[in-house]
């Protein structure tokens, strides 16, 4: 498992106009980012062991809505995230990114930051094809892997998708990244997964923050552990939980896997 024992994420996922509105974002966005950074750093420093802070960089135009992505507007907002979160960040993690354009824009904006750089994408899980994972945009994972070859990232993760679709993505990414890094004499980026416990979203659910979602009752801590063990067997070094994965799930992961996983809750 990963060398890091504990990671918390900043509570910054919702500090974008999609969630808080354009006016509030313009008036208070910077102050909210600064406050979230302070709270996360204070929490990490309050315990007698090393806890790293991962600065959460969300989709700039809403979760599961890659068609709304616009490069220049995204860059402007991402630069604000970088400005306010860099002082506390051990890691930057772009989370729930749903298209090649979202992913490559994020990597470009944060390419020269001092913190580790993690890229986490969300996978299409409504109509998956075995052995051919796709991003929420419908673009093949293979296209993303080709597009980010040569770009800087320290970990590639998959999040906020059903656990059933994660293993194919882990397997394919491991093979492709190992082939590329071996050819260039570089170390392979880490690979990880942190799934959600949502039921399948239909097309009407695409405004994923318009309501409170029900959770799957079958994703118990024990069931989630079985998925996680499969991901580890396939080469994942970072394991955590996204929406609907509780502290109880994470506790069982930490106690059951050989080393404590990196845990990725959606809040600090």
Residue spans for each PLM region:
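Domain-level signal for soluble alpha/beta catalytic cores
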Residues: 4-268
């Amino acid at each position: 498992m990963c060398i890091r024992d504990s990671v918390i994420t900043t509570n910054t996922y919702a500090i974008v106009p999609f969630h808080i509105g354009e006016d509030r974002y313009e008036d208070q966005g910077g102050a909210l980012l600064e406050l979230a950074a302070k709270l996360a750093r204070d929490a990490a420093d309050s315990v007698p062991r090393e806890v790293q802070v991962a600065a959460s960089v969300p989709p700039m135009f809403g979760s599961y809505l890659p068609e709304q992505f616009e490069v220049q507007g995204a860059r402007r907002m991402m630069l604000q995230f970088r400005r306010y979160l860099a002082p506390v960040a051990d890691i930057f993690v772009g989370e729930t990114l749903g298209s090649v354009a979202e992913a490559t824009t994020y990597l470009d904006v944060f390419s020269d930051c001092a913190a580790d750089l993690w890229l986490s994408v969300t996978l299409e899980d409504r109509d998956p094809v075995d052995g051919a994972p796709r991003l929420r945009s419908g673009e093949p994972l293979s296209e993303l892997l080709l597009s980010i070859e040569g770009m800087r990232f320290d970990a590639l993760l998959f999040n906020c998708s059903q656990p059933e679709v994660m293993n194919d993505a882990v397997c394919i990414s491991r093979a492709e990244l190992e082939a590329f890094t071996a050819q260039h004499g570089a170390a392979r980026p880490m690979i990880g997964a942190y799934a959600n416990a949502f039921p399948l979203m239909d097309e009407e659910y695409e405004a994923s923050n318009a309501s409170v979602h029900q959770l799957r009752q079958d994703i118990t801590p024990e069931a989630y552990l079985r998925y996680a063990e499969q991901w580890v067997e396939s080469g994942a070094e970072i394991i955590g939980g996204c929406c609907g994965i509780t502290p109880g799930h994470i506790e069982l992961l930490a106690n059951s896997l050989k080393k404590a996983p990196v845990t990725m809750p959606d809040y600090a």
